[in-house]
C-alpha cells in the first residue's frame, strides 16, 4: 500500500520559493473574479495570500476549492466560496503539480484531488500552475501516476490495469486505512511503468477502462511558473495559448 503524501509546509527548504510564487500569482486576482483554488502545499500558500488580500483590501471575489482541505482553509481565512454545483467559468485557477515535462504536460494527484482539480482546469479561462524546480522532469513518471477508481469492482479494475502493464498499489492514510477521495473513491498509485513518453496515449487507454474515474495526467492549457533556488521565477507556456 502507498501512503498519502504528507504535508511538510514550512519544514520544506523550498517553502520560501512557494511563498514567493504564491505572492506573484495572487497579484493576478482582480475584483469580481471567480478564482479556482488548487490543492497541495503551494496552493495552500496561494490561499493564505488571497485571504490576506480579501481581508486587508476588502477584495470582492468568489472562489471554488478543489478539495475539502482547501475549502476549509479558504473558509478559515475569509474567502467566500461558490457552491460547487454552480461552477461554470472560472476566471483564474491557481494550482500546483507533482511533475512537469518540457511540453508542459503534468502529473497531478499527489494529494488525491485530481478529479476536481482537472474540472477546475477545464473551466479556467486562465490556468497558472506553480512549481519549484524539483518538479521539472525530462519525462513524466518519476512520481507515481495516481488513478482515481470507484470502489465498486476496484479489484477487477486493478487486475485489468496489471494485465495492461500498469502496476502499483492502493493508497493508504497515515493510519493504514484505505485513502478515500472527496468523491468517495480510491486512489491506485501506478509505479510501473516509470516513464511516459506519450502520456496522451496512456490517458486515452486508461480512461477506456470502466471504473476509472480519472487519471493524474494533465494535458491542459496552462501557464507553468517555476521557482528556482536562486529566487528567480520563470514563466512558461505553450505557443499560441492565451
Curated annotation (Swiss-Prot):
Catalytic residues as annotated in Swiss-Prot or TrEMBL: 117 (proton acceptor)
Alphabetical list of Gene3D superfamilies matching this protein: 3.30.70.260, 3.40.50.1360
Record's keyword annotation contains Isomerase: yes
GO biological process: pentose-phosphate shunt, non-oxidative branch
Pathway(s) this gene product operates in, as recorded in its UniProt entry: Carbohydrate degradation; pentose phosphate pathway; D-ribose 5-phosphate from D-ribulose 5-phosphate (non-oxidative stage): step 1/1
Record's subunit section: Homodimer.
Primary gene name: rpiA
Family: Belongs to the ribose 5-phosphate isomerase family.
Superkingdom: Bacteria
Catalysis: reaction(s): aldehydo-D-ribose 5-phosphate = D-ribulose 5-phosphate
SUPFAM superfamilies found in the cross-reference section: D-ribose-5-phosphate isomerase (RpiA), lid domain, NagB/RpiA/CoA transferase-like
Binding positions for substrate per the UniProt entry: 39-42, 95-98, 108-111, 135
Keywords: Isomerase
The protein's role, per its UniProt record: Catalyzes the reversible conversion of ribose-5-phosphate to ribulose 5-phosphate.
Alphabetized GO MF terms: ribose-5-phosphate isomerase activity
Leading EC class: isomerase
EC number per UniProt: 5.3.1.6
Protein name: Ribose-5-phosphate isomerase A
